[in-house]
């Protein structure tokens, strides 16, 4: 499979693809002002477009390379490769839904605040994970609880 297709999408990669630098907060700047909202809107839209392109590329790749190999081992290898591609496609599709939810939060002026405690999530955390809906403290607590539940 092509190397380009196997690249992992990261928020830093999305920043560079969007042609953006990390946001430089100004002194006494209000949290989630117009500039910050625009910054994250561009990041999310670019990320969504990139994921949609990858999904389309996966479908085209599978359609173009679907061959009925006479050798069962070759056929099994191809099926496993396609299975991995489809699993990645499904993961991307779920991430697109999270991005769309986050874009909706931006439109509703509810972006950047923790769903649990309503505190500011923070610019750097949102740049690292633009779809974050919990502040670092609430996320840490949730992970500790999850770890305790699973043992």
From Swiss-Prot:
InterPro entries: DksA_N (IPR048489), DksA_RNA_pol-bd (IPR012784), DnaK_N (IPR037187), Znf_DskA_TraR (IPR000962), Znf_DskA_TraR_CS (IPR020458). Interacts directly with the RNA polymerase. The lineage of its organism: Bacteria, Pseudomonadati, Pseudomonadota, Gammaproteobacteria, Enterobacterales. It is found in: Cytoplasm. NCBIfam families: dksA. PANTHER family: RNA POLYMERASE-BINDING TRANSCRIPTION FACTOR DKSA, RNA POLYMERASE-BINDING TRANSCRIPTION FACTOR DKSA-RELATED. Transcription factor that acts by binding directly to the RNA polymerase (RNAP). Required for negative regulation of rRNA expression and positive regulation of several amino acid biosynthesis promoters. Also required for regulation of fis expression. GO terms for molecular function: zinc ion binding. Keywords: Cytoplasm, Metal-binding, Zinc, Zinc-finger. It comes from Buchnera aphidicola subsp. Acyrthosiphon pisum (strain APS) (Acyrthosiphon pisum symbiotic bacterium). This is RNA polymerase-binding transcription factor DksA. SUPFAM superfamilies: DnaK suppressor protein DksA, alpha-hairpin domain, Glucocorticoid receptor-like (DNA-binding domain). Zn(2+) binds at residues 114, 117, 135, 138. One of its GO terms (cellular component) is cytoplasm. A zinc finger (dksA C4-type) spans 114-138. Its main location: cytoplasm. GO terms for biological process: regulation of gene expression. Belongs to the DksA family.
